[in-house]
Amino acid sequence: MHLKSVAAAVTVGAAVLVGCESPVPNKRLDLSCAARAEGKTERRVCVDDIVSNMTLEQKVAQMIQGEIRDVTPQDVFEYGLGSVLNGGGAFPQENKYASVQDWVELADAYYSASVDTRGGGSGIPIIWGTDAVHGHNNVMGATLFPHNIGLGATRDPELVSQIIGATAREVKATGIDWIFAPTVAVAKDARWGRTYESFSSDPAIAASFVAPIVTAMQAEGIASTAKHFIGDGGTLRGDDRGDTSMPLDELVAIHGQGYVEAIDQDVMSVMASFNSWYGEKIHGNKGILTDLLRDEMGFEGMVVSDWHGVGEVKGCTNDDCAQAVNAGVDMLMVPTDWKSLYHNTLAQAKSGEIPATRIDQAVRNILTMKIRAGLFNRGLPSSLAAKYQDQIGHPDHRGIAREAVRKSQVLLKNENQRLPLSPSGTYLVAGPGADNIGQQSGGWSVSWQGTGNSNSDFPGGTSILDGIERQVSAAGGRVVRDINADADIDAAVVVFGETPYAEMQGDAYTVAWYDKRGERKLINALVEKGIPVVAVFLTGRPMWINDLLNQSDAFVVSWLPGTEGEGIADVLLRDANDAVQFDFVGTLPMPWPALDVNAADRDMPVDEFAFPIGYGLSVTQAPLWSALSEELIGADNSLDQEVFKGGPRGSWKLFTGDKSDWTVEVTSSIAQSSSGSVVVRAVDRVVQEDSRRFTFAESGGDLSLIYMQSEYPTDLTDLNEAGGALVVEFRVVEQPTATTTLRMDCKYPCSGEVTFTKVLLDAPLGEWTRKAIPTACFADAGLSLEQVNTAFVMATAGDLTVDITEIKLATAPAIRSIVSCADLVNDTALLN
């Protein structure tokens, strides 16, 4: 059904619903004061009056926040829900390419359902929250700015204020009211997968950006959220959702200063953190969420939980956690299980397990935020959004982003003042990141993890290659892409680095950077040819990369610059008259590691540094380079490769196929093969969308398949000699009804195939299982190990439903997980 039809159905169908049993006993409320209340006193009086007249069911409904993939406008009408959100990779109609109008229509549908009182509903407007963490990053065509780590390198809070204003206007264009930002984390261990969401590891630098952000966002009428309270950046080993153990005064001094700034600016909401403090989950810790945040720090706004965060509290589940409410959580972000959460919370409120006073205070906090955000006098979201339709990807916003990009670049090395380059020269521009807007944008870019994207998914954006080529061509110079091109190359600009990731999936065991796409081989070849190398390193954290720092003539830390790649060309190149266009002004927001791990204690962050916070050269500086040690202290795991972890990793891409089309790339949270014989859907194992469910349906005896493929073939010879294996962590939901095979390809038809049916049938139904299939088994079946471009193919002609959370190539799989090649044989007897 089209969204306009959904909205109409909600309104027209209301009269029919009057005679039905509604989950929420309805009571019409007088909300007139909410549209005119100004100042704290008036708001308090108004909110007290509204809450005193609400039913318990209406109150609990206000505390529930579901996700747009699991909440319909009809649900909002029937339950009177307080909020919805779109998580990373969630779109209207589950369409990655949803238009701005699609977003607005869905916002109108939710709003209309929430204020429709003809069935006796409360009429309280719903509020929609979104993770616009570096621009309106879920929306096609939006301006994507540098991630926070890059903004921290600019040391320019005023520029960041402009970025937030632009982001807020793009969010308003889609009818959304609330942004889950700023992240005020102080990242202390770069192994943490959310390091790039932190402005700095220095509490003072990180805090300096907070007040301008909150002020700019709320000045645009968008509710802001300081997150994640508290200690998310201080966990042991940098583990996302791990434990932060330090005295309370130290916790506040290091990880709390951003909240002090946010509270001073009357931030509307705070999000609870996934981490624990001394082993107790923050989501269930009253001492943190109430005693510290409210009583000591003076926060008066609304506390929202993180995605299924309540389910991590001891004794709780995603849909049952009185402890979180009693601890101080006002709104419960439970995307999928919100209905059972509503009923359980209501029962706990009725029994007194959650005191009535606590329920009332939570609802007061929610309604106060809604009044402050202007929801009661704003009307249909489309009425406001219409004024901002030209703001998505507006040229002014892209100009701000381009300025932020060039100011965020940090120059670590510039031998013989190699930079900036004359645009009239001839340059090789190479590396996997050169023409890859997705890689330069990082996580939280269209999709949650930032994977599954191509340049066409960023309309209006500019790759680094495009930016360089545009300026060089305009000055009469030349850009080539092939190292063997028939050209006298003046220098090579090599763009490389981390591939996109977000929380959990970005956690690392070391800060060493391992190339998986031949980057080191490329740079070595350039050095051997005597071609000067300008390295542009795309990264979400400081990393140990000493060998390439030593080899490069110039080394630029580009962070994750977003969609405006020409900002990098602005500092790499002189203007047409050979004058410096823009100098490098970026400085390190975090120290740059001299070691790959902490030499004394691997659980601790690296504590020896090559460059301190604040380091960054200008083009006029050329300090004598002192070679850095290239010795790894930690284990060299460079042969290991993560192929899939909740989604494709590195250069690997996920495809599905059947005889209608073998090459359907999976780029969103739900997809299917051309004929529908394979359906792919994101599911949660532990955290948001950390797994995929593959449902195969029998289709006349024809094969259907899923596979992981890369345009960069990998040589598995050394991994195989080290006893390596293809490791798959999976859960069988429905057992196979026909032979199921696993295959690795060396550019098909070169391949090696084994039968996987017995492994699937032997796996406990509904339980997670990890199995390691030796690469030798595939080699014995015909695989040429030198050029493997497809690491995993699962194929069957029957029914099968299997969840997969991880696929990796590993040198040291757990012995008990290893499958004997003898068990990967004919399965005819097993299926009869």
Question: How should these model regions be labeled?
Answer:
Residues D780-A791:
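Noncatalytic modules at the cell exterior or secretory-pathway interfaces
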Residues A635, L639-S673, I815-N832:
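Activation corresponds to long, low-complexity, non-globular regions
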Residues M1-C20:
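Gram-negative bacterial Sec-dependent N-terminal signal peptides
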Residues I366, L428, L572, L726-F730, ...:
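Buried hydrophobic-core signal for structured, non-transmembrane domains
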Residues G650, S669-M708:
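Short carbohydrate-recognition loop motifs
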Residues C20-S651:
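Glycoside hydrolase catalytic-domain context in secreted enzymes
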Residues G701-G782, T796-I815:
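Extracellular ligand-binding interfaces
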